[in-house]
Regions:
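Polytopic transmembrane helical bundles with strong interfacial aromatic enrichment
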Residues: 2-10, 45, 128, 165-167, ...
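Amphipathic alpha-helical interface segments
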Residues: 78, 82-158, 165
């Protein structure tokens, strides 16, 4: 039986239990989305404490909240998308092989869109967190840095899922974009690390 898909009303402990359950979905994509949302939340907190140090802090709060609102629903969307992959994989063997392969390929392609959206939003979180680490209240530099590193983890995890889902679609532009996002976020977090060295 599939786990419930209303993650927004679960406690952290319940969400962890849902992930740990012996079900195929939710899994890595949902965790990546929640990780990105947590990074956005931490970024919003650091921005709220940075209003005296950075005139753009109120805008950063709004941007971080918007990113969190984008990322949280992607946790549920990813679980649903992967359930559709599982349905395609469970098609009866009597179904024409070409039809079955096409259904699986289409489901995997659609399933790649969600982690791609998670990666895109999480790069934005990392960018904002990096700005806060540099310009915001330095008493919260560590929090802003943690937000950037969590966002990097969300990007890398999501990009990996894009590559897995599109493994049979050589030349798909989403593969290159996923790799590009990983490189972008690595540069961002490298700057955050070097700023405190």
């Amino acid at each position: 039986m599939a786990a419930p898909l209303d993650f927004s009303n679960q406690s952290v402990a319940d969400f962890c239990e849902t992930i740990a359950a012996e079900t195929s979905a939710p899994g890595g994509g949902s965790v990546a989305a929640v990780t990105g949302a947590l990074a956005a939340s931490l970024t919003a907190m650091a921005a709220r404490f940075s209003k005296e140090q950075w005139e753009d802090a109120p805008g950063a709060v709004a941007q971080a909240e918007a990113l969190k609102a984008r990322l949280l629903p992607l946790a549920e969307e990813d679980a649903r998308a992967y359930e559709n992959v599982l349905l395609a994989l469970r098609m009866p063997k009597e179904v024409d092989e070409d039809v079955r392969d096409a259904a699986i390929g289409d489901a995997l392609s659609r399933a790649a869109d969600v982690p791609m959206a998670i990666a895109e939003a999480s790069v934005d979180v990392a960018t904002l967190a990096s700005e806060l680490a540099e310009r915001g209240n330095q008493n919260l530099h560590g929090d802003a840095a943690v937000a950037a590193f969590l966002a990097e983890a969300a990007v890398r995890a999501s990009a990996n899922l894009v590559e897995i889902n599109l493994a049979t679609r050589e030349g798909d532009e989403r593969l290159e974009r996923a790799r590009e996002l990983v490189e972008i976020v690595r540069r961002i977090t490298r700057r955050v690390s070097e700023a405190r060295s």
